[in-house]
């Protein structure tokens, strides 16, 4: 039986519905994946700002602008402005958080939306063997229960969006 693990169980396990767990387990069985590690689910505005900050530091502005839409780009612009002003990490994340809240967290990232309507799940690519990744990706692409699926290098993680049944 495949297993779903959480990088941060106390934060994330309650944000993945029984329905989404069934979807993931079905995909894992079909693709022959014994285990996955979920790295992120629903986020607060502050968590979203922190993650965006870390990704901007690691991947750069240009790369991250390809990942987000117009609202996310405004947060990236806020990062760039604060960075140019010589602000420290905590000040930059605080400024980004304020901007996210002003724009509406759900507009910036679906991770900041309502999990009772949409489960947004990031899976660590490293939790899936390289040889199994193409079958895993194909299985997800063929599953109508997944509304959006992003893969590296566009997204650092496997990013799945699973609409919740009414």
What annotation goes with each model-predicted range?
Residues 37-54:
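Acidic helix-start/capping segments at beta-turn-to-alpha-helix junctions
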């Amino acid at each position: 039986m495949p297993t779903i693990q959480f990088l941060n169980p106390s934060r994330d396990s309650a944000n993945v519905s029984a329905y989404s767990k069934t979807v993931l387990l079905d995909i894992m069985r079909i693709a022959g994946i014994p285990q996955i590690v979920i790295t992120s689910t629903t986020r607060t505005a502050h968590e979203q700002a922190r993650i965006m900050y870390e990704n901007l530091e690691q991947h750069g502005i240009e790369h991250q602008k390809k990942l987000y839409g117009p609202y996310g780009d405004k947060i990236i612009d806020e990062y760039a402005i604060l960075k140019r002003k010589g602000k420290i990490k905590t000040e930059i994340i605080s400024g980004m958080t304020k901007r996210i809240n002003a724009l509406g967290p759900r507009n910036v990232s679906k991770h900041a939306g309502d999990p009772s309507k949409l489960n947004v799940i990031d899976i660590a690519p490293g939790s899936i063997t390289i040889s199994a990744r193409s079958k895993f990706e194909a299985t997800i692409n063929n599953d109508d229960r997944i509304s959006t699926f992003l893969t590296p290098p566009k997204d650092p993680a496997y990013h799945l969006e699973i609409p919740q049944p009414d």
